[in-house]
Amino acid sequence: MTENFQIPEDLKVMLDALRRVGRPRLVGGGVRDWLLGLVPKDFDIEVAGTDFESMIRTLSPFGVTDVVGRSFGVLKVRSKATQAEYDFSLPRKESKTGAGHRGFIITPDPTLNDHEAAARRDFTLNAISYDPFSAALIDPFNGQADLRAGILRHTSAAFVEDPLRVLRAMQLAARFNFSLAHETALLCKSIASTYKELPVERVWGEWNKWAIKSKVPSKGLTVLEQTGWLVHFPEIANLRGTQ
């Protein structure tokens, strides 16, 4: 992808304002989708170098602000100009404190650099960010190479701290025809016993994405088989070998 990220005009105005108080970056799935040649449906912006109250004050003139997570630095803004909704957040650190998907303490830290902020992402291809002012991609984990190769690879060993990421790998593989890196599959296999720690609604959320958005559904099931997680879904496991 060589063309610049097509940012909505109302969001550009917000980014210009944020530039005066911090360092905004586009992050997450929107950047990934753009690099895949798709039109991003969501715009997530991470703002370093500022505090949460300054971010709220800066964005309030542009729409209705909804503080959805003050303790972990997340703000939604519904644009006055278009009624589009954008997510803004501070960079944050995660500390594992208990079992399962929710056993974390999340701490906003606007002093984190791009590499440190990206380290909490699940896969390298989701850890790419975009500087809207220089049009530069920030890619500390070589996610662009994995994206071109269609490989889901973990950013760090902390991947195993959230077992939901295995099911996220399942639905991403199915949606984008991705394959799972061998070393990532081994990590997933090492936490297969933690499946029961996951909330039912979060498990359903990942399966729902698989069911609705899959391009190659079998790729997701292959991920489950590679990782030893297929055993948790016996009804599907029993279909192996059928046509």
What does each of the following model-derived ranges do?
Residues 1-243:
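Catalytic cores of the polymerase beta-like nucleotidyltransferase superfamily
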